[in-house]
Amino acid sequence: METDQDMHDQAMAGEETDLDEKYPNRPQNKAPTLPFHDLYETLFRPLREIKKKPVGPAGNRRKAGPHGLSAANLNPIERRRDIIERFISRWRKEVGDDIYPAFRLILPDKDRDRAMYGMKEKIIGKMLVNIMKIDKNSEDGFNLLNWKLPGQSATSSMAGDFAGRCYDVVSKRPMRTEFGNMLIEEVNEKLDQLSSASKEEEQLPILAEFYRRMNPEELAWLIRIILRQMKLGATERTFFDVWHPDAENLYSISSSLRRVCWELHDPNIRLDAEDRGVSLMQCFQPQLAQFQMQSLDRMIARMRPTEDDPVFWIEEKLDGERMQLHMVSDASAPGGRRFRFWSRKAKDYTYLYGNGIYDEAGSLTRHLKDAFADGVDNLILDGEMITWNTEQDAPEPFGTLKTAALSEQRNPFRQGIHPLFRVFDILYLNGRDLTRYTLRDRRNALQKVIKPVHRRFEVHSYEEATTKAEVEASLRKAVAEASEGLVLKNPRSPYRLNERHDDWMKVKPEYMTEFGESLDLVVIGGYYGSGHRGGKLSSFLCGLRVDEGQSSQGSNPTKCYSFCKVGGGFTAADYANIRHHTDGKWVEWNPKKPPTTYIELAGGDSQYERPDMWIKPEDSVVICVKAASVSVSDQFRIGLTLRFPRFKRLRMDKDWKSALSVQEFLDLKSHAEQEHREKEFNVENFRKKRVKKTTKKPLAIAGYDENAEVQYAGPSGHIFDGLNFFILTDSNAPVKKSKAELENLVKANGGRIFQTNDAVPDTICIADRRTVKAASLQKKGDIDIIRPSWILDCIKQSEIDAGLPDLLLPLEPGHMFFMTKDKEEIVAGSLDQFNDSYARDITVEELRNLLDQMAKDGKTDSFCSPEAIQKVTEHIQEKVDSGWTMPCGWLFKGLVLCFPENENDSASEGPEPKQSQRIHLAQNTAKFAGASVTTSLKDTSITHVVVDPDFTSSELPKLRRTLSTRRKLPHIVKVNWIEDSWKENTLLDEEQHMPVYMRRYPNIQLMKV
């Protein structure tokens, strides 16, 4: 009788035979693959430690010898590449030319040949509890199953890092303390089995084998591979570039890691010209639209219009899933055609949309029998798969797409929702690659080969335009129809594979100025944050009170429908205030017994946007929220939600009974949309290049609380993960900390404490005084001794950079109690010629001294080129759009602040008045944080007028007369709006910072932007 292992071995043998036939020249390794522990020892860990190891950047002081730079003098990018090159060179020498087994583990998110595991953190945590026979209610059981929550001990206090939690728990009960005995190839085989297992009971013994054969660190890395969350600090482009000069190009046209490894195993053999284009039945990486820029004028300029051809195209941005369709004529296939569908992430959706005309499981291809012109043998189309509601003859939100496809599979004759493929590009036709042709030529070809099928398979329309006014008109229409926005396209451009380029540019309504009303919503749920906000409720689920007419008979009168999540705009004081009024009233959400008496979520049993904690409406608070727009969403109970909601203030004058109801919201929405159609839209300065500053007055330091003590608040993080410390003394400066306090700070931030310098390798010695032990270490002369100020600076900088990757500060001369000769040049390289740190945010006093020294030296550095600044700006914006925290230097980005000149100031003599100095400080802060600053009220782009506290009602008429001709008037705020927003690192509500008399007499309040 055949066992499961026998069947698996037979399947593997059959797969190998198929691969040999498909890749007859694939490389063969000459030796077994490296042990799995070598992978993390020589690659994973060194790459992660680049951002951990406290060494200075190379900067502009690097000195190269006759053989180039030493490893210690390489900058982080060069060191990262050096590590990858060494690993690949070793693989080629010791194993062979087939690096595919290693790349599958290094870049698991790019491996399309291995199916998804169907295992997220919760399932893995439950399995580990089972495997290690831990009580789920014990401390370790709780920490594994509730990994986002703060741990119950100092070592497990960090929330939000699941693999770290697993390491913490497994290291207490490891099956192995030495390296495991699994080879990379064995790990791949077991992962293949894991991905093919369909049930948890089939996956459990496989994970148990990993636990038995790996040490805790190996298992933690394996879990990162399973979750496809490596976070190595190096992208696939870096690995591809080191592997072969054509690797990135081949991946762009094939999305196949296997092809990159097997077809490009020899770096000296380049791809042929005919192999550099898209191919039938090979998934490519599509072109993406660039993010919105400073202004419509600038975006239009990026379309590169010419005198002879000034036209650009405007397309509606569709709310669906990017999809590519490959079709080839095949006489052996029923209906004579074969189809393949892939998403932008290279997921194969052929099973959902169909592989042939008569595929009964196909929700789309069954309608494509007559969709192509005669003579079309094969093609590749690029487009968007959307959900279409036949009853409403309108699109549905993106989240309903898979439901629509499955519904169409089950019953193709029912009315309701179904997939609609909107095609906007053709890249391949009858054996010819069209990517090098212009968009206009490709569109002409598309129109000739496609025969649209109504509401099933259509060519996406576009409008030709030459002016900004035409774009603005299309934007009005887009918002009125609740569209995703617009895409501007250059019709003279080629198709750029795997590239986000200015030839296509997004214009989205949510980037416009405020939309609609401020809403008073009741808080009904809370979500724990991750990273620096881990262990605390950092965002809230808000609901709409159910009206009597909408509630079912006998239902709870306090019931609320889920409406939106709010996480922006809160200050530390706001969080504290909410905690104060709701303390002891929060209840953990139980998915098996949801509190449907009080709260109703969307999705039925799926419980969309399920909070971590919930609270009864009568026990909760009401918050005032504003947002960019209202959008359709099936993730919330009423089918609508807010785009980019932002907290304004806590409404302690209201309770749940006076919070917004469902019907009141629908009435407000209808009224706001009617007004919105009549207004002109202003596109915010979304990607504004920083303006060069010319200082006319002596530079003042932008710091509003210069006397505040430097103290550590809330020690918790990962900044010292993997580091070992020996702390010899207490800290004397910049603040006094005892030895025990320093040790607790280190442990709370991931470090380990030892009481000798030689207990473990690479121990960091910390001292601020010349004790007997410190003097003994110094006398040896081979150990660096670092001052405690470096620990405090690292923690402080980590808090400032919350949301960014944890990076240890490079050591500076001031951090060194004693250093060895070979460290002197490296440490000196962490400062520039003015002794300004390359990595650390310096204090006000340090900045003042530095500026004084610069003035004495009379030296200035040249500015970066505008092109370089723009490139860096766009790179940062991509990171922000993908979920990173907005840098403090962009807090006021896109705003134009006017500081009107006071006539009395210009006539006065003597020292600068205190209030004028305060305004000047605010101007510096605003400029530093990305705002454009002007003193002229004639500037039509002004978004805020900033006045000092002495601004009186007698000055208002003149100000209003100056601004009265504008269709949209700016906010008028006191200078402390800038000060308070900067301190809280979030844009605060303008209404709370208007001059006092304007709040007292609301009839004179100016219209908002």
Curated annotation (Swiss-Prot):
Name of the featured protein: DNA ligase 4
Originating species: Emericella nidulans (strain FGSC A4 / ATCC 38163 / CBS 112.46 / NRRL 194 / M139)
Cofactor(s) in the UniProt record: Mg(2+)
UniProt keyword terms in alphabetical order: ATP-binding, DNA damage, DNA recombination, DNA repair, Ligase, Magnesium, Metal-binding, Nucleotide-binding, Nucleus, Repeat
Region (Disordered): 1-34, 51-72
Reactions the enzyme catalyzes: ATP + (deoxyribonucleotide)n-3'-hydroxyl + 5'-phospho-(deoxyribonucleotide)m = (deoxyribonucleotide)n+m + AMP + diphosphate
Binding site for Mg(2+) 1: E384
Binding of ATP, residues: E315, K317, L318, R322, E384, F424, E484, K489, K506, K508
Source organism superkingdom: Eukaryota
Domain BRCT: 715-808, 887-995
Keyword check for Ion transport: no
A single Gene Ontology CC term: nucleolus
Chief location bin: nucleus
CDD domains tied to this protein: Adenylation_DNA_ligase_IV, BRCT_DNA_ligase_IV_rpt1, OBF_DNA_ligase_IV
Protein family according to the UniProt entry: Belongs to the ATP-dependent DNA ligase family.
Basic residues: bias regions: 51-65
Chain sites annotated for binding Mg(2+) 2: E484
Active-site residues per Swiss-Prot or TrEMBL entry: K317 (n6-amp-lysine intermediate)
Gene Ontology MF term list: ATP binding; DNA binding; DNA ligase (ATP) activity; metal ion binding
GO BP annotations listed: DNA biosynthetic process; DNA recombination; double-strand break repair via classical nonhomologous end joining; double-strand break repair via nonhomologous end joining; nucleotide-excision repair, DNA gap filling
Listed NCBIfam families: dnl1
Subcellular localization(s) per the UniProt record: Nucleus
Function: DNA ligase involved in DNA non-homologous end joining (NHEJ); required for double-strand break (DSB) repair.
EC number of this enzyme: 6.5.1.1
